């Protein structure tokens, strides 16, 4: 801690550390030791094995073996409500943190059972702001299958992976077959044949859906949502073409433009 380092702009974007200048190292610098236990839940920290590189990742993380680490649960709520997931307007990180601290939410399904009368009486809130949040949450309850798969926060399942999986399952009934051990094993073998789904994603799906706590969380969530089937457009001027967005867009975000093209 306290070293002077040389960095370069890698990939034209990311600052990459090339080396530490030991000639400029002060006597009072300290070696940084990565925590061997999660400061939140106490689980032993790990470096995950990457099935693509066949090496351990550089990142040290909490494995959350029981899927009950409070820090991870809270951050998953933020991910769930984010723009690329359920996109709940006006339900940002600060509000989620506030409701978490007040023990009003812990799991995604809790969002759809909030007491808005109580919320209207909180500091900084009122009838109008509570009503607007209620409307935004109700609006978010209609969601496509791919958005749901991404929103529940399965490790290594990003937006494109979620779309690939949704294209395979098509509807929530088929997707729920992952909940059952015998069917899950057979399905996971099929998924390995899909473009963009590799051993890393399949292992992550197996770990996630083998946990009873996760199954309860997702099952309770599904009851609160109107999940539409995944539909692939096979018509239009963009069908079969690869579209790339670069630079800034004036009237919409890249995600919104991408959604329109799809």
PLM feature spans:
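Short, charged beta-turn/beta-strand-edge "cap" motif at the junction between a beta-strand
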Residues: 3-15
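Long, charge-rich boundary regions
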Residues: 5-6, 66-123, 128
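Active-site-proximal structural scaffolding
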Residues: 10, 31-34, 55, 70, ...
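Cys/His-rich short segments
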Residues: 12-88
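General structural feature for long, well-ordered alpha-helical segments within catalytic domains
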Residues: 34-37, 73, 95, 107, ...
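Interdomain boundary/hinge elements
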Residues: 38, 112-114, 145-149
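DNA strand-break repair and replication-stress modules
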Residues: 122-262
């Amino acid at each position: 801690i306290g070293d002077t380092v040389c960095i370069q702009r890698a990939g034209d974007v990311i600052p990459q550390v090339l080396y530490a200048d030991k000639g400029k190292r002060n006597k009072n610098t300290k070696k940084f030791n990565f925590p061997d236990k999660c400061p939140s839940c106490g689980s032993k920290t790990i470096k995950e094995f990457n099935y693509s590189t066949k090496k351990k990742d550089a990142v040290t993380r909490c494995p959350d073996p029981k899927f009950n680490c409070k820090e991870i649960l809270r951050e998953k709520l933020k991910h769930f409500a984010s723009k690329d997931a359920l996109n709940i307007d006006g339900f940002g990180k600060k509000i989620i943190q506030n409701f978490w601290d007040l023990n009003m939410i812990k799991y995604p399904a809790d969002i759809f059972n909030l007491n808005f009368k109580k919320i209207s009486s909180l500091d900084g809130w009122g009838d109008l702001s509570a009503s607007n949040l209620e409307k935004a949450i109700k609006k978010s309850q209609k969601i496509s299958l791919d958005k749901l798969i991404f929103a529940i926060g399965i490790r290594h399942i990003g937006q494109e992976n979620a779309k690939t999986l949704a294209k395979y399952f098509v509807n929530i009934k088929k997707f729920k077959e992952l909940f059952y051990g015998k069917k899950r094993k057979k399905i996971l073998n099929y998924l390995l044949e899909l473009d963009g789904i590799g051993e890393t994603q399949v292992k992550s799906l197996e770990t996630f859906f083998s946990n009873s706590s996760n199954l309860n969380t997702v099952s309770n969530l599904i009851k609160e949502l109107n999940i539409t089937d995944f539909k692939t457009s096979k018509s239009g001027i963009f069908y079969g073409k690869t579209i790339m967005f670069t630079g800034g867009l004036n009237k919409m975000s890249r995600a919104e433009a991408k959604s329109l093209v799809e």
